[in-house]
């Protein structure tokens, strides 16, 4: 990226028009991005009358405030040389947000001598380094808020027998042997923990199994008892039915035996009355026959 013409390096005029039309560019990789590159990028928003590049930041002076605001809106957060730019109006500094335990006094915003002063208040001028520090503080705050990426889970390897070597005449363990022993110790402790967990789980499962078996045995006993009770009740009902049937049969037999005994006197009486009537008829006929004679 190259520009056609280079502008002046003056970006520290104190008149209100210049202050309101000046753009601050923070988080700039000045080791790669040069002045001509900045002019080429920001010249599309309007005429540039001044451009100064410093370590980590730069200033661009436009002819009008409208061009400066358009550049801020269009180029803010743009990534150049691997870094997102922090662009804002130089005459509208953002409030300083210090980290806890690292407070910056208000007097630090002003100094008597400045490399690039742009606003004078009572003999003091704003410190442009304040913009740079503010940007980096905000950048670090952002990185602090972003959670780190999750680490990959490294599978445990089999513990190997750590063979330590010693120098002749000196009882000093080698670094490799020590690291291997540490790794083997950690892996063995991990395997012990796993075996303990497995043992506890196995015990719990066996306890649960015994409980289930006992419950099943109880259920089987209850079912057998219910079946036995049902069979006993069934037998009792059958026996009672048989007794009732036997009683009914015996009663019927008794009734059938009593009926002829009761009817015998009636038959004899009928025969007697019939004989008397016949005798009476014969006597009356004989008397009538005698009278006729």
Swiss-Prot record:
Residues 21-92 form the RRM domain. InterPro entries: hnRNP_C, Nucleotide-bd_a/b_plait_sf, RBD_domain_sf, RRM_dom, RRM_HNRPC/RALY_subfam. Residues 192-254 form a coiled coil. SUPFAM superfamilies: RNA-binding domain, RBD. Residues 159-195, 245-293 are annotated as: Disordered. Residues 259-284 have a biased composition (Acidic residues). Residues 176-192 have a biased composition (Low complexity). Gene3D superfamilies: 3.30.70.330. Keywords: Coiled coil, RNA-binding. GO terms for cellular component: nucleus. GO terms for molecular function: RNA binding. Signal peptide: none annotated. Disulfide bonds: none annotated. Belongs to the RRM HNRPC family. RALY subfamily. This is RNA-binding Raly-like protein. It comes from Bos taurus.
């Amino acid at each position: 990226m190259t520009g056609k013409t280079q502008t002046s390096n003056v970006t520290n005029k104190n008149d209100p028009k210049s202050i309101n039309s000046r753009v601050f560019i923070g988080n700039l990789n000045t080791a790669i991005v040069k002045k001509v590159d900045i002019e080429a990028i920001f010249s599309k928003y309007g005429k540039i009358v001044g451009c100064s590049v410093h370590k980590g930041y730069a200033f661009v002076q436009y002819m009008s405030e409208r061009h400066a605001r358009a550049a801020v809106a269009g180029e803010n957060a743009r990534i150049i040389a691997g870094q997102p730019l922090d662009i804002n109006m130089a005459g509208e500094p953002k409030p300083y947000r210090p980290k806890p335990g690292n407070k910056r006094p208000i007097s630090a915003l002003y100094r008597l001598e400045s490399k690039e002063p742009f606003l004078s208040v009572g003999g003091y001028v704003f410190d442009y380094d304040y913009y740079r520090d503010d940007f980096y503080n905000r950048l670090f705050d952002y990185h602090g808020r972003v959670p780190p990426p999750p680490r990959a889970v490294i599978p445990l390897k089999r513990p190997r027998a750590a063979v330590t070597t010693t120098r002749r005449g000196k009882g000093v363990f080698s670094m490799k042997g020590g690291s291997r022993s540490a790794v083997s110790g950690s892996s063995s402790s991990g395997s012990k923990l796993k075996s303990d967990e497995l043992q506890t789980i196995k015990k719990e499962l066996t306890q649960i199994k015994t409980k289930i078996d006992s419950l099943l045995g109880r259920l089987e006993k209850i079912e057998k008892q219910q079946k036995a009770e049902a069979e006993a009740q069934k037998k009792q009902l059958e026996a009672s039915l048989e007794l009732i049937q036997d009683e009914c049969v015996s009663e019927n037999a008794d009734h059938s035996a009593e009926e002829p005994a009761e009817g015998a006197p009636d038959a004899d009486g009928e025969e007697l009355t019939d004989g008397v009537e016949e005798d009476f008829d014969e006597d009356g006929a004989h008397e009538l026959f005698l009278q006729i004679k």
